[in-house]
Amino acid sequence: MKQTTINHSVELVGIGLHKGVPVKLVLEPLGENQGIVFYRSDLGVKLPLKPENIVDTKMATVLGKDNARISTIEHLLSAVHAYGIDNLKISVDNEEIPIMDGSALTYCMLLDEAGIKELDAPKKVMEIKQAIEIREGDKFVKIEPDSQLSLNFTIDFNHPVIAKQAHHFVFSKTAYKEQVAKARTFGFLQEVNYLRSIGLAKGGSLNNCIVLDENSILNKEGLRCEKEFVCHKILDAMGDLMVLGMPVMGKYTSFSGSHKLNSMLVKAILADAKNYEVLIATDPAKEFALQKAFA
């Protein structure tokens, strides 16, 4: 297996979720061993995707460096992870990645348009070697060794529409596009009203978010799938795990996890070299195993 980038540049314009202003997003190819690099084109600031550059995880995963910030990176990164892209330049002219329809579907379509190009260098994959768990009250995220990437997520909301949902997702690009990519972000009307009162969620609408009142979904079209709520959490987790800098082989499990816990998990993995091994696809046996895991 070889490292990849996109075949040619692509771009789109969309609205930022919190500021509600138009944002131009440009994806450009990068050479081998460059990784995922964000760029604020309006400020001329480069923001490499590294755990130490994650500066906020309250409402979204936020990248920051030299007084420049880029918020809501997780949906795009989730698609990048699913497509196995190792090297990519992501430029925006404002401080948010466009929310689009609230899922990763638009970004999958954009990557399909860009095409995937193999580079000369061998692909690197992180294999988890021992279990790591992060807890906050009854909430937790955990990752442990496995020969593939799987995500097991459970959510439990005191709401009649959501209640308790669980989904076990074994990664493949096809399964991601069928089960996960279309799952939209969601929020509660009371929270949306509060966020707007403090100058946030200005770009949020029924076109890019599932909104719930006390008893029901306000979106007339309803849900895209029965487990859309928990599948969106899996979408987010795949984006947050991309901060590791490469695809990961491991069994991820979460109960009511969050961007904050995912970020803490990423940092905990990298804090001790005994937690992981970087596999380089140079010998046939490893290459076969990696191809099977990331089909």
Swiss-Prot record:
Top-level class of the enzyme under EC nomenclature: hydrolase
Keyword annotations from UniProtKB, A to Z: Hydrolase, Lipid A biosynthesis, Lipid biosynthesis, Lipid metabolism, Metal-binding, Zinc
Biological process annotations from GO: lipid A biosynthetic process
Keyword Lipid biosynthesis: yes
Example GO molecular function: UDP-3-O-acyl-N-acetylglucosamine deacetylase activity
Superkingdom of origin organism: Bacteria
Binding site for Zn(2+): H75, H232, D236
InterPro entries on file: Ribosomal_Su5_D2-typ_SF, UDP-acyl_GlcNac_deAcase, UDP-acyl_GlcNac_deAcase_C, UDP-acyl_N-AcGlcN_deAcase_N
Enzymatic reactions: a UDP-3-O-[(3R)-3-hydroxyacyl]-N-acetyl-alpha-D-glucosamine + H2O = a UDP-3-O-[(3R)-3-hydroxyacyl]-alpha-D-glucosamine + acetate
Enzyme Commission number(s) of this protein: 3.5.1.108
UniProt pathway: Glycolipid biosynthesis; lipid IV(A) biosynthesis; lipid IV(A) from (3R)-3-hydroxytetradecanoyl-[acyl-carrier-protein] and UDP-N-acetyl-alpha-D-glucosamine: step 2/6
Active-site feature positions: H259 (proton donor)
Cofactor(s) for this UniProt protein: Zn(2+)
Listed Pfam families: LpxC
GO cellular component entries: membrane
Keyword Electron transport listed: no
Function recorded in the entry: Catalyzes the hydrolysis of UDP-3-O-myristoyl-N-acetylglucosamine to form UDP-3-O-myristoylglucosamine and acetate, the committed step in lipid A biosynthesis.
Family membership: Belongs to the LpxC family.
HAMAP family reported in the protein's UniProt record: LpxC
NCBIfam families: lpxC
Protein name: UDP-3-O-acyl-N-acetylglucosamine deacetylase
Species in which this protein is naturally found: Helicobacter pylori (strain HPAG1)
Taxonomic placement: Bacteria, Pseudomonadati, Campylobacterota, Epsilonproteobacteria, Campylobacterales
